[in-house]
Design a protein with these regions (language model features):
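N-terminal beta-strand block that forms a small beta-sandwich/beta-barrel module immediately after a flexible targeting
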Residues: 19-65, 80, 93
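Surface-exposed patches in structured soluble domains
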Residues: 52, 76, 86-141
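Edge-of-domain interaction segments
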Residues: 19-37, 188-251
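Short coil-to-beta transition motif at edge beta-strands of beta-rich domains
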Residues: 70-80, 146-159, 224-227
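Exposed loop and linker-edge segments at protein-protein interfaces
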Residues: 67-84, 240, 251
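Short, solvent-exposed secondary-structure boundary/capping segments
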Residues: 46, 50, 59-62, 98-108, ...
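Hydrophobic membrane-insertion alpha-helices, especially the h-region
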Residues: 9-23
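Short, well-ordered beta-strand segments in soluble/periplasmic domains
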Residues: 95, 122-161, 166-174, 180-191, ...
């Protein structure tokens, strides 16, 4: 009887020791959590472009008379510009001439846009020109891969290093050729800025998004809903994610 009791006591002691070892080892078998610190960032969705501005421009006839109008002044039709010279139309006056005032809307193809500024005709003796409409066009080339997401009717902002943003609307997309896509934009207003622009390299700002950057490895889908796990005061909380911008390897 005594030996049975001793064997039972030894078994209980062994179980107690083994149980302690199992409990102590449990943390070793828990999955390791990888945590990241969330960073708030702003992402700009842009497309690099090169293009040409066209507008309604009326070159004034050559004159030896002293011109009386200041730069960028608004001129009414029939106003006296100089002795013996009256304005044939209303518009904004500028003395800036670049030899491309005769250009008209090109075919919306890559070769046509590349050749658009190949014919330069500098007016001789002219005191300047009138910009006779507040509307303008911008014909541009973009790499086809970058322009793949563009759709007619969408609005964007053209930014270049030496001018502020110009609001544009995409009116037409031409056929891609040699990895480039021709684009036709229209706009209005901002003529005090636009009247000095012709050939421009810049970027189209399609959108700007501010949010928390998350790598794809931190996201999972359940019942068609995208989630991530947020560690708050030592507890994991499943949190739905609304994607503002998908950069490929992070959102």
């Amino acid at each position: 009887m005594k030996s049975v009791f001793l064997r039972a006591a030894g078994l209980l002691a062994l179980c107690a020791v083994f149980g302690y070892i199992v409990l102590a080892a449990l943390p070793l078998f828990r999955p390791r959590l990888e945590t990241i610190r969330l960073e708030r960032i702003t992402v700009r969705d842009t497309v690099p472009v090169w293009g040409v501005f066209l507008r309604e421009e009326l070159v004034l006839p050559a004159s030896d008379c002293l011109f009386r109008q200041p730069e960028a002044s608004r001129i009414s039709a029939g106003a006296e510009l100089a002795p013996g010279l009256r304005s044939p139309s209303a518009g904004i006056y500028t003395a800036w001439l670049d030899g491309y005032e005769h250009l008209s809307a090109p075919a919306l193809t890559v070769p046509a846009l590349r050749a658009l500024c190949g014919d330069r005709r500098m007016p001789l003796g002219s005191p300047g020109k009138l910009i006779t409409s507040s509307r303008f066009d911008f014909y541009a080339l973009a790499e086809s891969a970058a322009a793949a997401g563009l759709t007619p009717g969408s609005r964007c902002t053209l930014e270049c290093s030496y001018w502020g943003g110009i609001e544009l609307q995409l009116t037409e997309i031409g056929e891609s050729w040699q990895d480039f896509t021709p684009l036709h934009f229209s706009g209005s207003g901002d003529m005090d800025m636009v009247m000095y622009l012709r050939q421009v390299s810049g970027v189209l700002l399609l959108g700007e998004y501010t949010g928390l950057r998350l790598p794809d490895s931190a996201l999972y889908t359940e019942n068609d809903v995208l989630y991530t796990d947020v560690l708050t005061i030592g507890e994991l909380q499943r949190t739905p994610v609304h994607v503002l911008y998908d950069a490929g390897d992070y959102k």
